[in-house]
């Protein structure tokens, strides 16, 4: 039998296992050299021999540095090499069948952090060139955001407060969990403008692997209305009750004019230990989010992903604000739509922050159940906010002045579009009632921001058309993933399919259509530090479940199994839960207790008449006495019910006929529901409780934990993360 010869090439993508084998072999050779062994051929002779082979066999120029590309499944490696990494390389690609690689040419290399390496870019194994090809700082990777570094000349620290001075148009990037305010001058942060006239502190949680916030100093003479001109009582500052000046500041008798007097803008920072940095205790992969020593740190040297505001966003928002300043203006109803991953949520957050300069409140209609801004996934909601939206969703403490949310029980409206449209109709009707009351009271009418889901093909286009008919927007913004500027270098991302926009958006004339660009194309590499949608949803859900409403902070040190539960009866005269509803396929009544125990459920407040006088549903009791609504697996009517929050049904006490559940519930809402004689219903949807929420990290033995199977020795088929493919084309499609 003839042995198969292995053909190697400097441009052939190698797997991570091959790279590791080459590195280990090089380390072994160095160890042998240190023990006194002599090499048969010197490095110079090997290099000359290798160059001769390359010239003889392929007539290609020799390569000084050997490039190895780490192959990651699902990532397109056909991208063009970065200009810096291709300066010393030939433009001609050697033939895969004619070129060889000498393993001795590989040198040792070490990766400092997985956050600084892109799996889609070729890595040079030479130590000196790794720092050149891999962007470690924004100055080398992203010239559009020239952030400054904190030095002794532009900063001043007094105990727990850090003061940083900025000149006009200078930018500062910070990461961590901290609070900030303007001591002198004005600055902008992702569309929101802060002024020294407001003495309150604002919280910000800026983890790594997300867009780093950028503080930009602006001209103090700008005659624009700022957020700080409103009364401080109207701002949403309940979650961080911090005095304007600490006793330590009074001790040093600091005056704003005496702090860094050579700078027009001075920003004060303080560390804010709110417990979020300890999220890695319950979610291991979140360790890289806060992988820095201090809770307040300069991001100029540790981040290469900054919050970028394209020029098209700025011009659109300026035009919108200018139109609202006219006497005959119409209060805008802005709908933001586009495909998945196009930056709809980012732009909605940006335009909301800009509009807060002109309005005291903004109505936000969040119709994306997969990536909501305030509530966990699986909900759509309407809320009124009066403070800027800063930071990632899971790291945001936001308490709207009013909120109405409805539970879909799924991250997509695809399985029940009729119920989704009914929920949208209910939420928009609530906004219309509010506007009507404002007009009667002759008060300010607030604008509406509508964030749509990313499902825009097929049935998604029909849903989007229905949303337009219901909400009647005055402005429609379509977010495009296509590069609108040819000056940007070509980039490959996880979104490779052709751009698609529904035809009805351009054919209808009752609104103004605007196409805006996404921000992913401005990043050094869209695939670097990418947090998937599933991980985002898990972060948001765990952040929600571990939030302590009484202390206004996160508590990841206590497991959900160790938290004191809320106990309420489901049977008897003093019952607190009137019924249980299960969305999905019809269920046998005997299996109710097993189906809902240890699951994620929504707490609903329903109108009494909707349950008593309904012809399509009835309430029966299970063998355990649990009241179950029989309505063919349909959700509750959104016109007569609303969601109070998410809970984890931890235990069903059959002896006392009680439900024990945990979750950040607002007990005042439950008390108000009882006062209005509303019935409390638990609804089980299709949302899955993460495995990390079931674990009790205090225990060492996982085999005895219920509902959890952790077998480290053998992994069964199907035990990995579930992945659904929706891009499979059947053969029947090609049959004429």
Curated annotation (Swiss-Prot):
GO CC terms, sorted: chromosome, subtelomeric region; Las1 complex; mating-type region heterochromatin; nucleolus; nucleus; pericentric heterochromatin; perinucleolar compartment; rixosome complex
EC number, UniProt record: 2.7.1.-
Keyword annotations from UniProtKB, A to Z: ATP-binding, Chromosome, Kinase, Nucleotide-binding, Nucleus, rRNA processing, Transcription, Transcription regulation, Transferase
Presence of keyword tRNA-binding: no
Residues that hold ATP according to the record: 338-345
Subunit structure: Interacts with crb3, rix1 and Las1.
Functional description taken from the UniProt entry: Polynucleotide 5'-kinase required for both rRNA processing and heterochromatic gene silencing.
Name used for this protein in its record: Polynucleotide 5'-hydroxyl-kinase grc3
Species this chain originates from: Schizosaccharomyces pombe (strain 972 / ATCC 24843) (Fission yeast)
Gene this protein is translated from: grc3
